[in-house]
Amino acid sequence: DHAMVSILVVTGGPGVVRAAMQRHKKVIAAGPGNPPVVVDETADIPKAAKDIVAGASLDNNIICIDEKEVLVVESVADQLKAEMEKHGAVELASEQIERLTKTVIADPGRRGHEGMANKAFVGKDAAYIAREALGLAVPEDTRLLLCEVDRGHPLIWTEQLMPVLPLARFSTADEAIDYAVECEHGFRHTASIHSKNVERLSRMAKVMNCSLFVKNGSNYN
């Protein structure tokens, strides 16, 4: 409210943004995000895996630009997962994923509803989450808990803000790109793609229309 402050730059969640908007000053504020990353069959898979783990695990995924869900073309999905495991991701089994979801998601997201994570797990280490939510011991330096799910799963639609990364398979890159638009909820915040196909790179950039769009790199670069 200081008289010499004419503009507020705010991030940190809807509560903080709402408070800033009530100050009767100009406001630049960051909105919600659920950044998808698409990986197609032309991508450099080892590099894509390294970049995704690096980006999605940055500050335990609490940063809103971090990769939140992986949408991968079926033909390279297994290779991508194997490469991600080389960089500190630990894949969970289906039963573990469902137990984890019930614990770390307070309000399951879906099409048209962004949902909400359980704040008790936001920003926690992957090893802590595995231990507390599943009673599972994983290496303390685990960077991500990798969860292969179907495309309608709440983990795809909910911004977790923790090192829990859902992955879903798609028949084609175009199908994955179209789904990326949906699960990002139209926030137009952040999205990324790993591909050597220029037409796909351009198409995703246009249809996502995000403030931040990354091609063949991690979102924090």
Give the residues covered by each predicted segment.
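Active-site phosphate-binding strand-loop segment of PLP-dependent enzymes
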Residues: 1-11
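Short glycine-enriched loop/turn motifs at secondary-structure junctions
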Residues: 2, 31-32, 63-66, 114, ...
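Short, structured coil segments at secondary-structure junctions
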Residues: 3-4, 23-24, 208-209
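Structural motif
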Residues: 9, 38, 71, 165-167, ...
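Generic beta-sheet signal
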Residues: 11, 30, 73, 215-216
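Short gly/Ser/Thr-rich phosphate-binding loop of adenylate-forming enzymes
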Residues: 14
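ALDH superfamily catalytic-core signature
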Residues: 17-151
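Conserved C-terminal structural/oligomerization subdomain of aldehyde/semialdehyde dehydrogenase
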Residues: 136-221
